[in-house]
């Protein structure tokens, strides 16, 4: 498989010309540590939350047997946050959701005007919506000064995006971290997310869309089918580090999506050296 080094990545960004001004190399160590922490939780969700950070308290399980959607409500008292995490694809049932590209009205969030979202992931979201909203409400009532964080990888990333969108209608101070997120909806949905999560700039964004090397999943579903990405993209290239993380705004095809990756590849299953469910970190 073709490897993407930081040197190669910089050459790609510079060659892009119009994209140069919207792409910068390097993020702070604090932000990098935060992205790695959220990636750890998201990758651990494939294996019943193995090896999560010691400050994380494992709470209630989110599960629907018909869609095989899995998630958890977690709490971190050290950072004063309530974390919702979703597992990515783990079964044939999940795969059926992945491949349902039909754009569907986001009816559970009517204030998202004109929004259509990935049909399969919307089915998954609706199947656990009541659980998620009830469990989050319980946690917020017990810890009213805690922030809300939502995260996930792959299918779990898109579920995290839909969940964060829904919760944003009720709660303030929500942060969203996704890893290897497919395109989750149409341009109206992407615009809604950018507005709701202040994603017009890396200085204000609360929507951190993390990609890796030539991960092929962020290229799906195709833009030709009406899909678009939201959020600020943080593109990690190897060897992974704060310095080798690019901040990409504007044209969504300038960083990860420009590398030509297709579908599930090694770059998709591994983020910051952690492979989905491997628990070797």
Curated annotation (Swiss-Prot):
Glycosylation sites noted in the Swiss-Prot or TrEMBL record: 100
Signal sequence extent: 1-21
Subcellular location as annotated: Secreted
Top-level taxonomic group: Eukaryota
UniProt cross-references to InterPro entries, sorted A to Z: AB_hydrolase_fold, AB_hydrolase_lip/est, Fungal_lipase-type
One term of GO molecular function: feruloyl esterase activity
Reactions mediated catalytically: feruloyl-polysaccharide + H2O = ferulate + polysaccharide
GO CC annotations, alphabetized: extracellular region
Positions of substrate binding: 98, 101, 268
GO terms for biological process, alphabetical: cell wall macromolecule catabolic process; lipid metabolic process; pectin catabolic process; xylan catabolic process
EC number: 3.1.1.73
Consequence the record notes for mutating residue 92 to I: Active against longer alpha-naphthyl esters than wild-type (C10, C12 and C16). Km value for the C8 alpha-naphthyl ester is decreased by 1.6-fold compared to wild-type. Decreased activity on arabinoxylan
Effect in UniProt of substituting residue 98 to N: Increased optimum pH. Km value for the C4 alpha-naphthyl ester is decreased. Has higher activity on short chain alpha-naphthyl esters than wild-type, but no activity on substrates containing 6 or more carbon atoms
Functional note: Involved in the degradation of plant cell walls. Hydrolyzes the feruloyl-arabinose ester bond in arabinoxylans, and the feruloyl-galactose ester bond in pectin. Active against methyl ferulate, methyl sinapate, methyl caffeate, and alpha-naphthyl esters with chains containing 2 to 8 carbons (C2-C8). Inactive against alpha-naphthyl esters with longer chains (C10 or more).
Family: Belongs to the AB hydrolase superfamily. FaeA family.
Protein known as: Feruloyl esterase A
């Amino acid at each position: 498989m073709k490897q993407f080094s930081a040197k190669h990545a910089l050459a790609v960004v510079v060659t892009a010309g119009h994209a140069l001004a919207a792409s910068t190399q390097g993020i702070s160590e604090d932000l990098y540590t935060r992205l790695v922490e959220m990636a750890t939780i998201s990758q651990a969700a494939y294996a019943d939350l193995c090896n999560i950070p010691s400050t994380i308290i494992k709470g209630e399980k989110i599960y629907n047997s018909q869609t095989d959607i899995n998630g958890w409500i977690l709490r971190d008292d050290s950072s004063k946050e309530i974390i919702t995490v979703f597992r990515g694809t783990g079964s044939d049932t999940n795969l059926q959701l992945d491949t349902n590209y039909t754009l569907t009205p986001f009816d559970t969030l009517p204030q998202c005007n004109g929004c259509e979202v990935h049909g399969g992931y919307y089915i998954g979201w609706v199947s656990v919506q009541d659980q998620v909203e009830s469990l989050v409400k319980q946690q917020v009532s017990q810890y009213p000064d805690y922030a809300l964080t939502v995260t996930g990888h792959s299918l779990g990333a898109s579920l995290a995006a839909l969940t964060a969108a829904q919760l944003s209608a009720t709660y303030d101070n929500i942060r969203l971290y996704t890893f290897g997120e497919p395109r989750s909806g149409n341009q109206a949905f992407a615009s809604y997310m950018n507005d709701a999560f202040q994603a017009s700039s890396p200085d204000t964004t609360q929507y951190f869309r993390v990609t890796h090397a030539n991960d092929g999943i962020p290229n799906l579903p195709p833009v030709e089918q009406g899909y678009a990405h939201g959020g600020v993209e943080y593109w990690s290239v190897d060897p992974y580090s704060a310095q080798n993380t690019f901040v990409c705004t504007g044209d969504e095809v300038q960083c990860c999506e420009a590398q030509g990756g297709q579908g599930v590849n090694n770059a998709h299953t591994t983020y910051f050296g952690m492979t989905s469910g491997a628990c070797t970190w």
